[in-house]
Amino acid sequence: KEIMNLIGKGEENAVVVCSLGDASCTEGEVSEAMQMAVLKQLPILYFVQDNGWDISANAIETRAQNIAEFAAGFKGMGIESIDGSDFLLSYQSLQKIIHIIRTERRPFVLHAKVPLLNHHTSGVRKEWYRDDLDKAALDDPFPKLKEACILADISLDTLEKVEKESREDFLSA
């Protein structure tokens, strides 16, 4: 729509967000999409959560490189890798990258390294194929965010209230 001047009301500087898991990036369709995005300089954010796992195989078994390394082969693709378990860093990176995409009208890959805290799918129990559960728990973003809030002088009472309200909102949705 942008290239053909078919932008409608309220769509100025729109950004398309493709949220992907790391294993999906080994599929040909992702490569084709990135190739077209850089060729046409489309305003697309490829937000890749890299937990190092396919459904039941780890990254070492399924790919030669991470998406940031792979995407470097696409001339014109912006790329950034972050610790996705750090909420504040993630938020700041997203703000910066979305600003770049909106102003420069080009694609960008945000590679966020995150822990896999639960089962990958309901049919495959994590205990059956993983030996990294304790390490993954150490990278849980929620305790890190809570600690950052406390360091920013947000009281435990306030945090508990927000948690309770969020849980209630989630359960009632």
Name the predicted role of every residue range.
Residues 1-172:
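Glycine-rich ThDP/TPP pyrophosphate-binding loop and its adjacent helix/strand module
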